[in-house]
């Protein structure tokens, strides 16, 4: 049996903001917390500030990003290697 293809998820408030900006035809940054929303072709050319848990990171949407999720482009974790922490303790001695 084949499965039915579902529509991409986009938060309704984000979609309303995008439509409003498209009608104005002005470039402005759209702020969102919805990392699970898919990128639609109507979003191409806009700058969307996506929340990473601490702050909003502005991302410019281009054609290759269509179909992917907003959260894929903003990392939520900051990597600190063990070696860097170890070198700092030696310099303090």
Swiss-Prot record:
<dbReference type="GO" id="GO:0005763">
    <property type="term" value="C:mitochondrial small ribosomal subunit"/>
</dbReference>
<dbReference type="Pfam" id="PF00203">
    <property type="entry name" value="Ribosomal_S19"/>
</dbReference>
<keyword id="KW-0687">Ribonucleoprotein</keyword>
<dbReference type="InterPro" id="IPR005732">
    <property type="entry name" value="Ribosomal_uS19_bac-type"/>
</dbReference>
<keyword id="KW-0694">RNA-binding</keyword>
<comment type="similarity">
    <text>Belongs to the universal ribosomal protein uS19 family.</text>
</comment>
<dbReference type="InterPro" id="IPR002222">
    <property type="entry name" value="Ribosomal_uS19"/>
</dbReference>
<comment type="function">
    <text>Protein S19 forms a complex with S13 that binds strongly to the 16S ribosomal RNA.</text>
</comment>
<keyword id="KW-0699">rRNA-binding</keyword>
<dbReference type="GO" id="GO:0019843">
    <property type="term" value="F:rRNA binding"/>
</dbReference>
<dbReference type="GO" id="GO:0003735">
    <property type="term" value="F:structural constituent of ribosome"/>
</dbReference>
<dbReference type="InterPro" id="IPR020934">
    <property type="entry name" value="Ribosomal_uS19_CS"/>
</dbReference>
<dbReference type="GO" id="GO:0006412">
    <property type="term" value="P:translation"/>
</dbReference>
<keyword id="KW-0150">Chloroplast</keyword>
<dbReference type="GO" id="GO:0000028">
    <property type="term" value="P:ribosomal small subunit assembly"/>
</dbReference>
<keyword id="KW-0689">Ribosomal protein</keyword>
<dbReference type="InterPro" id="IPR023575">
    <property type="entry name" value="Ribosomal_uS19_SF"/>
</dbReference>
<dbReference type="GO" id="GO:0009507">
    <property type="term" value="C:chloroplast"/>
</dbReference>
<protein>
    <recommendedName>
        <fullName>Small ribosomal subunit protein uS19c</fullName>
    </recommendedName>
</protein>
<keyword id="KW-0934">Plastid</keyword>
């Amino acid at each position: 049996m084949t499965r039915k293809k579902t529509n991409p998820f986009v938060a309704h408030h984000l979609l309303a903001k995008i439509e409003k900006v498209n009608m104005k035809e002005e470039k402005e940054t759209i702020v969102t917390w919805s990392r699970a929303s898919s990128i639609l072709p109507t979003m191409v050319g806009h700058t969307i500030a996506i929340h990473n848990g601490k702050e909003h990171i502005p991302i410019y949407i281009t054609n290759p990003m269509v179909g992917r999720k907003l959260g894929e482009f903003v990392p939520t974790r900051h990597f600190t290697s063990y070696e860097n922490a170890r070198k700092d303790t030696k310099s303090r001695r």
